[in-house]
Regions:
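Alpha-helical residues within the helix-turn-helix
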Residues: 17, 28, 57
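Short alpha-helical DNA-recognition segment
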Residues: 20-39
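A short, Lys/Arg-rich alpha-helix, primarily the initiator
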Residues: 1-18
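Helix-turn-helix DNA-binding elements, focusing on the entry/boundary residues of the two helices
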Residues: 12, 23, 34, 49-52
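Short, basic-rich loop-to-helix N-cap that marks the start of a DNA-contacting helix
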Residues: 44-54, 63
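Short, charged recognition helix plus adjacent turn
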Residues: 57, 65-80
Length: 80
């Protein structure tokens, strides 16, 4: 399944803001470049599973929880 890039970035941005983290702090915790995180959140780049895993751990979330949020965001655009 291919996710829409914006549907991937938005839940990451929301989770980051819920935790009160800046992009600089989250990217540091996740071990990725801030510019990479910015591109993911803006929907300009699609992260691989390893990056999603790193971001989830940095957000103190289970990777499955972050993936579920991404899936939920993706399904918002699918008509019933």
């Amino acid at each position: 399944m291919q996710f829409d890039n914006k549907a991937v970035g938005e839940p990451i941005r929301k989770a980051r803001k819920e935790k009160g983290l800046s992009q600089d702090v989250l990217s540091g915790f996740a071990g990725i470049a801030r510019t990479h995180l910015t591109m993911i959140e803006n929907g300009d780049k699609q992260p691989n599973f390893e990056t999603i895993w790193k971001i989830a751990v940095a957000l103190d979330m289970k990777p499955s929880e972050l993936v579920a949020r991404i899936e939920q965001e993706t399904n918002k655009d699918i008509p019933l």
